[in-house]
């Protein structure tokens, strides 16, 4: 999974301060204001497109801290089918 993080970080031109994988029960990932990306340990058990979506989503928050128009536009550019993903945990 960290290989995918490196791929997406390069593609999105961001550099997370720390990437950690841990047990998460309510979310698939998060991005802190201090640049820490946290991914759910069981994310790796999901399909590759969903994993890419979550990683891209969290890393993109390093550039755009909200879910506004710029964020959704960039998500559509990088992960065109992201709106069809079932993100509920």
Please state what every model-predicted region is.
Residues 1-53, 62-89:
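Active-site-proximal or metal-binding-adjacent scaffold patches in catalytic folds
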Residues 58:
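Walker B catalytic acidic pair
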């Amino acid at each position: 999974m960290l290989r995918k993080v490196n791929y997406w970080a390069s593609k999105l031109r961001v550099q997370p301060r720390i990437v950690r994988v841990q047990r998460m029960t309510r979310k698939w990932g998060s991005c802190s204001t201090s640049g820490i990306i946290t991914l759910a340990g069981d994310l790796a058990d999901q399909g590759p497109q969903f994993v890419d979506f979550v990683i891209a989503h969290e890393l993109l928050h390093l550039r755009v801290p909200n879910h506004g128009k710029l964020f959704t536009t960039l998500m559509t550019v990088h992960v065109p089918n992201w709106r069809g993903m079932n993100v509920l945990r």
